[in-house]
C-alpha cells in the first residue's frame, strides 16, 4: 500500500484556519454558545427565566461529546472551559461569556451548576458526518430549552462558528477589531497605528522583511 495525501499540495490548511473570535470557549462549543446567546434573548422577549428551565438539549457532533461533555465537579478554569454544559449555562443565565466567568469566585454562583445539571448532549449523526467532511468542516450544535410549564423554545441551530471559513465576511471585521483591541492593551495609540498600517495592508506587508515586521512588536 502506498501512502497518498487527501489532496495535492496547496493552500487548503490556510484557507480553512479557524479563528477564535466570539467567545473564550473551546472550539467544539463555539456554536453552542452562540445558540445559547440567542436563547437568552428569546427568553427575555417571551417572559421566560432560567428558573423555569426544566431541561436543555444540545444536539451535537461526536467530538463535542467525546471532548467536552462533562458532568460532576469542575475544579478550575481549565475544567470549566472544556465543559460544554458550563459554557452554555453562562450565556443562558447572564447573556455573556468572558474569561472572568471561568474563575473560582464566579463559578461559585449556585445557579451555574443548577443549569449545568439540566443540560444533556445527544449525538446527531449528520452533524458528526459534516464535522468530518473536508469540504464542510462544520462544528454544529443545536439547542432547545424545555420549561417547567411544558412549553419549549424553538431549536436554535448554528452549523459554523464566526471564525469558520464559511463565515469569513462576517468574521474578518470582528477579527480585526479583536486584533486592534489587543494591540491597544500593550502599545500606545501611535505605535498601534504603525503596526496596523503595515499588517492590515497586504501589498505593503508582503514587501516588509520579517525582522522589520517583528521589530514593530517590540515595546520600548
Q: Where does each model-flagged region fall?
A:
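Terminal-appendage/accessory-domain detector
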Residues: 1-220
